[in-house]
A protein has these predicted regions:
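Sec-dependent N-terminal signal peptides
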Residues: 4-13
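Boundary of Sec targeting at the N-terminus
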Residues: 18-20
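The feature marks the first
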Residues: 24-38
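Amphipathic regulatory helices of Ca2+-sensor modules
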Residues: 28, 42-51, 66-79, 113-122, ...
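Acidic carboxylate motifs that coordinate Ca2+ or other divalent cations, activating on Asp/Glu
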Residues: 33-37, 57-61, 104-108, 128-132
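Blade-edge motifs of beta-propeller repeat domains
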Residues: 39-41, 85-90, 110-112
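Beta-propeller blade repeat segments, especially FG-GAP/WD-type strand-to-loop junctions
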Residues: 54, 86, 125-131
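Intrinsically disordered, low-complexity Ser/Thr-rich linker and spacer segments
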Residues: 71-102
Length: 145
């Protein structure tokens, strides 16, 4: 059951890039805000990201092999396509913070837990557009609004 819940959290990653129907970022906060206070902290993002790694590390060797990462990429892509997301932000999309080329620091085609987790602070900073130390739906409102 926990793997199902974590997989749902993973495939909801695309939702953080744009609004689903309603308030931009609301679904991201719903899935990543572990204490329910309406804001995602770096600690919460780190914990959830570790959960995501565990979900896709099928053989539990602390490495996402190319095949395991392919499954992760496919889950994210399917969610983004199903929700009409991923257009308009290009390489600057916060969703890109989990791409293999971002997380595979040594370029060997596999992503270790350390590589995946060491990318969290930069990814989180990209989400926290107002630099207040938390990610809220306000961080997803298009600039100029």
């Amino acid at each position: 059951m926990i793997r199902i819940a974590l997989t749902v959290a993973v495939i909801s990653l695309g939702v953080m890039a744009q609004a689903q129907q309603g308030q931009p970022g609301a679904h991201f906060v719903e899935m990543w805000d572990l204490d329910g206070d309406g804001a995602v902290t770096l600690a919460e993002a780190t914990e959830r990201r570790g959960d995501i790694f565990t979900t896709f590390d099928e053989n539990e060797d602390d490495i996402l092999s190319a095949g395991e990462h392919d499954l992760f990429d496919e889950a994210r892509a399917a969610d983004m396509q199903a929700n009409g997301l991923g257009r308009g932000q290009g390489r600057n999309s916060p969703a890109n913070g989990m791409l293999r080329e971002v997380t595979d620091a040594d370029g060997d085609g596999a992503v270790s837990r350390d590589e995946f987790m060491s990318a969290v602070p930069g990814w989180f900073a990209g989400l926290d557009r107002d630099s207040d130390g938390v990610v809220t739906p306000a961080d997803f409102v298009p600039r100029g609004n």
